[in-house]
Structures are given as structure tokens and as C-alpha cells.
A protein has these predicted regions:
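Transmembrane beta-barrel domains of Gram-negative outer membranes and organellar outer membranes
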Residues: 59-270
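Cleavable N-terminal export/targeting peptides
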Residues: 1-65
Length: 270
């Protein structure tokens, strides 16, 4: 739970937009301008990659860049790939990115297997991790709108002498009281090794998904750890046909210096 951002096209208005956009961008501080440029580049690259894969895949919409999980898993024989990039608003040298595939195999229809490759950079110092994950659905009652699962994951640092960085246990519950509304509740436990400083903390999260239109869903969440991280995220999810979802979200920490960030992400399911 506690581990989940189009270039301009030339046309008749290109010269007009270029003349005005230069002045608009210059109004932004350099750090914000660089963060915005990185997010736009990532959106373009991600959508390009997803579009190529979508051409050879039979996909359905799902997935996202949020922390709070739901109680659903992929249908047997289906997979998804999530990619996201997050940049801090006031610290251009602090950013995170992740690529996370997951599949449910027909031979084990109640288990979703996945892994995430993530890169975090803080003040110029970076760390890369790989996170194997498994999620077992233990309850699915469509007539009641209830789904319940158990998810476990491990965190292994690839560029440290001591690779094991911790593990997570999370129990996500989803209730769908109305056709357009889904409510998510998470409860779990986290073990962080942190270079010898071992910590054990309870984790929690709440979230909602409200589908405003066929192509648009609004999502919000609040999550945290006992004595640790506390934050919220919210934003729209754009459904591009049957193949791709794109997330645009803002987030803010509720502790310390109350850092703010912008995240862009894309999901493909096939």
C-alpha cells in the first residue's frame, strides 16, 4: 500500500501559442518550471509506450498511481502495467518514478502476482528498489458490492550493501454502495529496515472513486503510518478508450514541512 505523469502538436496556432507560452512559463519559478517540464515529458513518453503496447493487446481500463489499494484483483489471465512519475513542488531535486506490472494467472485465479521497479531521488541522492508483491482475494460478493483481499510485499534496495529494506502486509476492503461510487479502506503493518534502524508500524488508508462520466473518474485518498508518514492525494482519472487510464494528481504531506507534489501516471491492462 505504501510504496502506487503529451507533447504539443504542430498546427496553425503553433506560432501564436509559442509566442504566448514563453511568457507564461517564465512567470513560474525555475524549480516549478523544471518539475512541470519533467512531468509533461513523462506523460508523452508513457502514453507513447502505452499506445504501442495497446496496439497489440486486448485491454480494459483499470489501475492507477494511488497509494490506497482496493479489494479487487485482475481477472484470471489478465495483466496490467502501471507507470508513474512524481515531482516535489518546492524541491526540484526530489522526485520518484515507478514501473509496476501485475498478472493473475488462470492456474491461480485468486492470486495476483506483481513487482515494482522504483527509483527515488532526494536532494540529488538516488536509490533504486525492486518490490515483489502478491495479492490474494478472499471475498468477492458482487450482490453486496464487497471485495476483500490480503496483499504482501517486500522491498529490496539494488544499490546498497544491505539489500533488504522491509516488508508490508495490507488488507484492502472495497464497498460499492452505488454504481458510480467505490469506497476503499486499508489496514496493515509495515516493517522498515532502513540501514539498521528497524521500525514496525501500523498502516491505514481511506479513499473514494467517483465516476462522473464515461471518460472521467475523480479519486481522493488519505493514508498514513503510526508515528510516521501522513498524507493525502487527489485528482482526475481520464479513461482513454478501453485500453488506457491516465492519472493526474496532487498530493501533500501532513507532517514535517508539509511537502507538496504533482504526480502523473498511466495504466494499461491487457
Amino acid at each position: 500500500m505504501h510504496k502506487k505523469y503529451t507533447p504539443a502538436r504542430r498546427d496553425g496556432f503553433t506560432k501564436y501559442r509559442a509566442r504566448h507560452s514563453r511568457h507564461t512559463l517564465l512567470l513560474l519559478p525555475p524549480a516549478k518550471r523544471r518539475a512541470l517540464q519533467r512531468n509533461l515529458i513523462f506523460i508523452g513518453m508513457t502514453l507513447g509506450l502505452v499506445f504501442v503496447v495497446a496496439l497489440i493487446s486486448k485491454a480494459q481500463a483499470a489501475g492507477g498511481a494511488y497509494v490506497v489499494d482496493d479489494g479487487a484483483i485482475n481477472a484470471p489471465g489478465e495483466c496490467n502495467v502501471d507507470a508513474w512519475y512524481s515531482a516535489h513542488r518546492h524541491a526540484s531535486s526530489t522526485h520518484n518514478s515507478s514501473l509496476s506490472p501485475a498478472c493473475t494467472f488462470s492456474a491461480m485465479p485468486a492470486v495476483q502476482w506483481g513487482a515494482a521497479l522504483s527509483r527515488a531521488v532526494d536532494a540529488g541522492k538516488g536509490e533504486t528498489q525492486i518490490n515483489p508483491q502478491a495479492k490474494v482475494q478472499v471475498l468477492s460478493r458482487q450482490e453486496l458490492g464487497l471485495e476483500l483481499a490480503i496483499a504482501v510485499g517486500a522491498h529490496v534496495a539494488l544499490d546498497r550493501h544491505h539489500g533488504f529494506d522491509g516488508a508490508d502486509l495490507n488488507i484492502p476492503l472495497t464497498w460499492q454502495p452505488l454504481a458510480p461510487l467505490r469506497l476503499n479502506l486499508n489496514a496493515g503493518w509495515s516493517h522498515a529496515y532502513n540501514d539498521g534502524d528497524q521500525q514496525h508500524r501500523l498502516t491505514w488508508g481511506t479513499g473514494f472513486e467517483y465516476q462522473l462520466a464515461e471518460k472521467l473518474t475523480l479519486i481522493g485518498e488519505r493514508y498514513g503510518q503510526e508515528g510516521g508518514e501522513q498524507a493525502w492525494q487527489a485528482g482526475p482519472r481520464l479513461h482513454i478508450g478501453e485500453f488506457v487510464d491516465v492519472d493526474l494528481l496532487v498530493g501533500r504531506s501532513l507532517i514535517g514541512d508539509r511537502a507538496q507534489w504533482l504526480t502523473t501516471g498511466a495504466t494499461l491492462r491487457f
